[in-house]
């Protein structure tokens, strides 16, 4: 961390700043996941340092995405979860993605649907349906994260799942799963019994 900060302040002593960041955010992961506005509250962290720190998880996310893209057939909860995990790496707020699949369960696209709180009102069904139709998807997997909690479905998650399932069915598209991510863990609402297994139909 000290070496990284040096690139933002090459003439300064970055050791105290590195220690201050770790003291405030607890771990390296905490530092790299912190919002830019919170990073700049630490003495010695200016715009350049905050932007550089926030760049690290973005680069890591891209590297992990390129690795997960090697999973060709996404026909199980495990494969879908592993494919989607990198999209949430380093995110400090809730984000929603829609993984669009063709008839052979190959990824067509993974679309950012929403950033912010997850509920029926915030995730417009028409936006999800449009993204699925634009990708010419046969089925889709909805995914969102719980950045400060456990990967467990809330009542709102279940309600959102059922609303979107009905909206997608109306245009002939299967909601194959709704995956919830927290850190490096994920759970499936299909495995939870909220959705039928489309691969057993």
State what each model feature region is.
Residues 81-135, 139:
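Histidine/lysine/aspartate-rich catalytic loop segments that bind and position anionic ligands
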Residues 1-8:
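Charged, compositionally biased N-terminal leader segments and the immediate start
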Residues 21, 28-42:
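A short amphipathic alpha-helix within small helical-bundle interaction modules
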């Amino acid at each position: 961390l000290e070496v990284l900060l040096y690139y933002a302040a090459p003439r300064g002593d970055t050791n105290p700043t590195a220690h201050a960041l770790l003291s405030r955010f607890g771990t390296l992961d905490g530092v790299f996941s912190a919002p830019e506005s919170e990073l700049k509250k630490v003495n010695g962290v200016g715009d350049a340092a905050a932007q550089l720190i926030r760049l690290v998880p973005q680069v890591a996310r891209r590297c992990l995405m390129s690795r997960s893209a090697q999973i060709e057939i996404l026909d199980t909860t495990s494969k879908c979860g592993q494919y989607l995990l990198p999209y949430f790496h380093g995110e400090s707020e809730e984000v929603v993605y829609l993984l669009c699949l063709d008839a052979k369960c190959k990824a067509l696209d993974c679309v950012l649907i929403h950033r912010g709180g997850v509920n029926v009102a915030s995730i417009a069904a028409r936006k999800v349906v449009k993204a699925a139709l634009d990708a010419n998807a046969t089925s889709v997997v909805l995914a969102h994260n719980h950045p400060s909690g456990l990967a467990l479905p809330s009542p709102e998650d279940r309600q959102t799942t059922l609303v979107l399932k009905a909206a997608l069915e109306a245009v002939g598209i299967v909601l194959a799963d709704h995956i919830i991510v927290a850190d490096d863990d994920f759970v499936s609402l299909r495995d939870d019994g909220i959705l039928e297994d489309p691969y057993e139909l």
